[in-house]
């Protein structure tokens, strides 16, 4: 067992794996809650297996927003202690577990890979848009989804937020894209 653990620790580049997992996590955000959970858990596991906690803590200490997120999660966790209904408190706290991913992304994502994360998110939103328009124009159906509210994979409120975020990314890409073909594609996608 010890040799297997040594083999993996010596031969795996955890940071490369983490960067791929972050891209897959971004892809799943508008499409699959199960995918978000799976890749979120894998991100946490590989981040812990990577170790290098001293450098990670130093990075986190330099970013106040990440510190605030960690403080919020810590306070939320300790609030279970004074809750009268522990089961409800734990269930409510589960909503915030995705915030654990933010320090992992901050400490692991390489600057060169940020474009891949945004592109994965945009591609999954494109898939979601195509399915949504298909439902809206009644080209196909999906159980429980009506043409009047064609948000196929997530609830309407989340889908609206994802659409707004997608719009911001697309505007950025339209303004700063040097490739004319891609610029036209982003304009059509935006419309």
Where does each model-flagged region fall?
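Short hydrophobic "helix-edge" motifs at membrane interfaces and signal-peptide entry regions
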Residues: 23, 69-70, 145-146, 190-191
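Residue-level signature of transmembrane alpha-helix interfaces in integral membrane proteins
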Residues: 46-48, 95, 144, 171
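Aromatic-anchored transmembrane helix interface
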Residues: 65-72, 86-109, 116, 120, ...
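Hydrophobic, membrane-inserted alpha-helices
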Residues: 21-27, 101-102, 166-168, 189-191
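Juxtamembrane membrane-water interface segments that cap and precede transmembrane helices
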Residues: 18-23, 140-152
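Transmembrane signal-anchor hairpin modules in multi-pass inner-membrane enzymes, especially those
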Residues: 1-77, 81-87, 107-115, 119, ...
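Residue-level preference for alpha-helix termini and adjacent loops
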Residues: 77, 81, 89-92, 144, ...
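Alpha-helical transmembrane segments of multi-pass inner-membrane proteins
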Residues: 77, 114-144, 154-191
């Amino acid at each position: 067992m010890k040799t297997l653990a040594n083999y993996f620790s010596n031969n795996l580049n955890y940071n490369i794996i983490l960067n791929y997992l972050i891209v897959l996590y971004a892809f799943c955000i508008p499409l699959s809650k199960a995918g978000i959970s799976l890749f979120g858990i894998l991100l946490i596991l590989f981040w812990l297996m990577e170790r290098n906690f001293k450098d990670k803590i130093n990075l986190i200490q330099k970013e106040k927003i990440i510190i605030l997120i960690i403080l919020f999660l810590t306070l939320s966790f300790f609030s279970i202690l004074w809750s009268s209904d522990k089961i409800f408190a734990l269930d409510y706290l589960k909503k915030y577990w995705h915030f654990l991913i933010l320090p992992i992304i901050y400490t692991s994502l390489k600057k060169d890979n940020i474009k891949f994360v945004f592109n994965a998110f945009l591609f999954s939103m494109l898939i979601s848009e195509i399915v949504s328009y298909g439902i809206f124009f009644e080209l196909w159906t999906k159980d429980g989804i009506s043409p009047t509210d064609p948000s196929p994979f997530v609830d309407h409120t989340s889908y609206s937020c994802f659409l707004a975020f997608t719009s911001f990314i697309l505007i950025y890409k339209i303004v700063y894209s040097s490739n004319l073909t891609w610029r036209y594609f982003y304009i059509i996608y935006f419309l």
